[in-house]
């Protein structure tokens, strides 16, 4: 009987150790999640603030209708570029912007999901029909930057390219 009591106490101590370890890990995970939410969600646009357009009429009306008017100067050294991603290209193409200017890209699609990735930069946006994807960037070096679609959008996907020309 005494041996059983000692064995039970040993198992109980072992279980308490694992319980304490599990609770400590739970608190660590909760702290990490709280830290991530507090520090990595800045700048995320809540769903209610999304800009939407009618994908069936986006080519006929609004700022995406006329490629000649797609690059708009909104302030000193600030531009907004309205980009239409469609199967299988980008409009306007090429996009010409000045070096050092703050560029706000507003990208949408009239047909299917596309990607808008500018090589050599951290611009990488998923473009959904009916929604306007917005991204800001300042090109510090002049040159040509290639836009590629990195979201499969159909049989001509591999040929979907565009160009951004950054002028001095």
Curated annotation (Swiss-Prot):
Cytoplasmic side, ranges: 1-3
Chain ranges on the Periplasmic side, renumbered to this chain: 39-168
Enzyme kind, highest EC tier: translocase
Topology of the protein relative to the lipid bilayer: Single-pass membrane protein
UniProt KW Transport keyword: yes
Keywords for this protein: Cell membrane, Copper, Electron transport, Membrane, Metal-binding, Respiratory chain, Translocase, Transmembrane, Transmembrane helix, Transport
Pfam families registered for this protein in UniProt: COX2, COX2-transmemb
Reactions the enzyme catalyzes: 4 Fe(II)-[cytochrome c] + O2 + 8 H(+)(in) = 4 Fe(III)-[cytochrome c] + 2 H2O + 4 H(+)(out)
Annotated Cu cation binding sites: 114, 149, 153, 157
This enzyme's EC code(s): 7.1.1.9
Molecular-function GO terms, alphabetical: copper ion binding; cytochrome-c oxidase activity
GO cellular component, one term: plasma membrane
Transmembrane segments: 4-38
The keyword ATP-binding appears for this protein: no
Gene3D superfamilies assigned to the protein according to its UniProt record, in alphabetical order: Cupredoxins - blue copper proteins, Rhodopsin 7-helix transmembrane proteins
Coiled coil residues, start to end: none
Subcellular location: Cell membrane
Reported function: Subunits I and II form the functional core of the enzyme complex. Electrons originating in cytochrome c are transferred via heme a and Cu(A) to the binuclear center formed by heme a3 and Cu(B).
Family: Belongs to the cytochrome c oxidase subunit 2 family.
Name of the featured protein: Cytochrome c oxidase subunit 2
Species of origin: Thermus thermophilus (strain ATCC 27634 / DSM 579 / HB8)
Lineage: Bacteria, Thermotogati, Deinococcota, Deinococci, Thermales
Gene name of the encoded protein: cbaB
